[in-house]
Amino acid sequence: MVSVDTPSSLGKPRGDPRQLYRVGGWDEEIYVLGIESTAHTFGVGIASTKPPYILVSVRDTYHPPKGGIHPREAASHHARVASEVILDALRTVGLSIRDIDAVAVALGPGLGPALRVGATIARGLAAYYGKPLVPVNHAVAHIEIARLYTGLGDPVVLYVSGGNTVVAAYAKARYRVFGETLDIALGNLLDTFARDAGIAPPYIVSGLHIVDRCAEAASKPADLPYVVKGMDVSFSGLLTAALRLWTKAGSEDEKAAVCLGLREVAYGSVVEVTERALAHTRKKSVMLTGGVAASPILRNKVRSMASYHGAVADWPPPQLAGDNGAMIAWTGLLNYLAGITVDVEESVVKQRWRLDVVEIPWR
């Protein structure tokens, strides 16, 4: 399913790049095309040094008929839709590939076969049209697109998605990880439970995850294990316990109680770790990003926690919370302005490219 977002649907970014970023070039008119293919979404975005900064975001997401994401099937999907998604992005903003100043691509972290599709296409475009190739870390891109749209200069970051659960903050030229999942990510927990319990797909119903929908009917939460180890979280035991209770549930109310218990434990644990990071760093803002950041329930919990500590909380538009090409284009633009490019021959994908090893030259 293809989705196309433009400034009219994304809204106006609240951040001013001249204040958020320590790089020049904002007086020039520069366009960067970004390609995202780290998991189930093939996305293309175009970013500019001029307002509204994000010109377009086009996504085509692979939805397996059953089970989770198979890397090779996702890669086949990406290869099949790539050319049309790229053309849609260019046509929407009235540009040709020759108008683009650089091509950015997410080189990791992610699923190897899926990553390689995006990397191969980006290399081909850069080499054939003589454009600089810009490497982008997928996790950094989630943070930077959120900073642009929220305008938060120095937040504690809660990055939650299907493949990542990380609490981080910026210090000394890098995003430092305060806590993370020890096993599966928050989004993976929710999706796997819903799938194995037989209540998904679809995973999202009227803007809410199906687990959140299921939980609405509960009178009280089921008792489930809460695991926070220092600053890290663990969800595999929670998943096993929740599925065990689900199979024993004799009524719809008991099933709803399992959903509510799962949600409260999962969301509560990531909010607790974020709260500890906020108290430690004494920062004045919390920023939620990643696919699970689209959850209004998690948003409310984060906002309440931040408010208790006299901090503000914010997040990007839902269309930019999950995987998208716009965040790759924007972070690619920042890298390009900072002079970071890569030779085609050196542009290897990095499936386990950690957030905290990436130097951030624009802050």
Curated annotation (Swiss-Prot):
Disulfide bonds: none annotated. It catalyses: L-threonylcarbamoyladenylate + adenosine(37) in tRNA = N(6)-L-threonylcarbamoyladenosine(37) in tRNA + AMP + H(+). SUPFAM superfamilies: Actin-like ATPase domain. Its main location: cytoplasm. Binds 1 Fe(2+) ion per subunit. Fe cation binds at H138, H142, Y159, D323. InterPro entries: ATPase_NBD, Gcp-like_dom, KAE1/TsaD, Kae1_archaea_euk, Peptidase_M22_CS. Its cofactor is Fe(2+). Belongs to the KAE1 / TsaD family. This is tRNA N6-adenosine threonylcarbamoyltransferase. Required for the formation of a threonylcarbamoyl group on adenosine at position 37 (t(6)A37) in tRNAs that read codons beginning with adenine. Is probably involved in the transfer of the threonylcarbamoyl moiety of threonylcarbamoyl-AMP (TC-AMP) to the N6 group of A37. It is found in: Cytoplasm. GO terms for biological process: tRNA threonylcarbamoyladenosine modification. It comes from Hyperthermus butylicus (strain DSM 5456 / JCM 9403 / PLM1-5).
